[in-house]
């Protein structure tokens, strides 16, 4: 009841995931194995977390606005005095930091308009450790849940700067030397297309557009990158 009251009246919501625990061996401390690989559950001795906080900042006449922040990271399990960015196991990043609104798009009262660091909805099957294609999580703007035919359309424009590796004389890549390229990507999801009972279809797509500087073009022309 308290949680529902805070969510409905104050507009604050929390969701997330974290893991922690204790392990030991008869010969030194436990060692992680195949971190991030398929089927590695139980072999990662770390405290990974994924926490999302949201706060409603506007609510009037069917129009709402909400600020959302998502933190991803890891907390080391080996000692109690480690700090982030000290070269150890402690890691932290802001995966999301954006404002999302509903009711502000004329003629589309249920469509979400967002701006900031965010990406279109992503899917994964936790128990199978299977992850689908993920859009870029970078600064951008997007629309979600646009009614279109029998389904709904999501579309976003995101920034995705890339680092091009230098080209060796034999054509192989030399990633010790890189060239930054500003890139924008257009992502779309056409989802919730009904097929049969409890089954639907989703189409995903992406188009990248490089915004090359004169140096980028010269390096490409000279086959340096």
Protein language model annotation of sequence segments:
Residues 3, 38-42, 80-90, 126-132, ...:
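Outer-membrane beta-barrel domain signature
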Residues 92-95, 133-137:
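Extracellular beta-strand-rich solenoid/capping regions of secreted or surface-exposed proteins
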Residues 132-133, 140-225:
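Signature for the C-terminal beta-barrel architecture of outer-membrane proteins
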């Amino acid at each position: 009841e308290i949680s529902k009251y805070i969510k409905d009246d104050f507009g604050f919501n929390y969701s997330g995931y974290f893991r922690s625990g204790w392990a030991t061996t008869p010969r030194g401390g436990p060692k992680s194995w195949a971190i991030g690989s398929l089927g590695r559950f139980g072999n990662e001795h770390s405290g990974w977390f994924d926490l999302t906080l949201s706060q409603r900042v506007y609510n009037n006449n069917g129009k709402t606005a909400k600020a959302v922040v998502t933190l991803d990271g890891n907390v080391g399990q080996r000692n109690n005095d480690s700090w982030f960015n000290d070269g150890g196991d402690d890691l932290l990043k802001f995966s999301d930091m954006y404002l999302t609104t509903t009711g502000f798009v004329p003629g589309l009262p249920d469509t979400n308009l967002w701006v900031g660091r965010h990406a279109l909805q992503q899917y994964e099957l936790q128990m199978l450790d299977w992850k689908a294609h993920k859009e870029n999580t970078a600064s951008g703007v997007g629309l979600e849940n646009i009614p279109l035919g029998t389904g709904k359309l999501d579309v976003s424009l995101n920034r995705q700067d890339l680092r091009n590796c230098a080209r060796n004389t034999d054509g192989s890549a030399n990633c010790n030397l890189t060239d930054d390229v500003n890139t924008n990507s257009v992502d779309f999801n056409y989802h919730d297309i009904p097929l049969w009972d409890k089954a639907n279809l989703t189409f995903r797509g992406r188009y990248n557009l490089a915004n090359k500087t004169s140096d980028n073009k010269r390096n490409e022309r000279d086959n340096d990158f």
